[in-house]
Amino acid sequence: LYNNDMNYIRTIFDDICKNIGKKPILVLYGARQVGKTTLVKSVMAKFKNPLYLQGDDPKDALLIEGRSGRELVDIISGHDLTVIDEAQKVKDIGVVLKLIADNKKDAQIIATGSSSFELANKVSEPLTGRNRKFYLYPLSVKELAQACGARVIKNNLEEYLAFGSYPQIANAKTRQEKISLVKELAGDYLFKDLFLFGGIRNPFTFEKLVKLLALRVGSEISYSELAKEAGISRGTVLNYVTLLEQAFIAFRLRPLYTNKTKEINKSHKIYFYDVGIRNALIGNTDPIELRPDKGAIFENFFIAEMIKDRAYSGRNSEINFWRDRQGAEIDLVESSNAGKVIAAYECKWKETAAMPAPFKNLYPRATFTAITASNIVDQLALT
């Protein structure tokens, strides 16, 4: 069963609509092709006379570059909403947005960007207190289930584990189409902004490191070991990993610890926001049942979904992994900012799991859920 150009209602749609006007500028971050333009266009449909500017279009960019505050106000006057898509392409976008906010207190602007390191550098300082940030990720299980029903997602779980959930890939009609789309996306396209803005001198070395990281999903990583294998310095590895985080391609998970003598407290794990991208990076989109790395893919899929869910729900919590010095471990632990552990999850493709006794002793009030192929969709779609 393949979706046929489904229209997905994005979880943050209502939140964005409610926040327009509360702050002059809303900034929507997300990777390339994640659905930002589709989302802002559906927001625009609720307004009478919106203005849409495409930062990728030199004509649109020139319209607002190098203008005075008064000129910018004249350009957007008469429009009840202004959208600047791919705003990182507009020269001095932070100054442009600041001038609008300074000169039109009731401005209603949405700026989108696929490279937060660039847009954030240009936007954060000039707009302190006057902007609200939103993040858009590949389609979540919740969004997919709302569009086509949880049963369809359950029946096609292995497709999502192989190809991920970027909208165009979720909508592709054949397996072959999905393979070619995910390969194209995981090629230079997704990294285009990184090569443009990230100061990456050697794209070949960068891509080698990304592949090494993709092969280590779910394992604790050694930056020194990665540096040695990629033939670059440890500092460059750290810089590249930060760039991957800032482009919404990958993220680090840190360990939870309250007792340094019993629990590990320094190492990191790395995961990808989309398992399809991860699989394409290592050149393997084979069905999950045939794969030796199915446990790592399944774990990555669940953890990325929990990251999306936390972001969309606005929960003020921390997500970590846990391991003690004797080797007992848990894939994901969510805790409040005060360090109070709320819930622990262990991912097992088929078999079930129990809470490790050392964890239970340290965190007696935490709930524990074993996530398997049979309960993952209900766990993610219905909670």
Please tell me what each predicted stretch does.
Residues F117-R132, C148:
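Short regulatory helix/loop adjacent to the ATP-binding pocket of P-loop NTPases
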Residues L51-L81:
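Short glycine-rich substrate-engagement loop in P-loop NTPases that contacts/grips substrate
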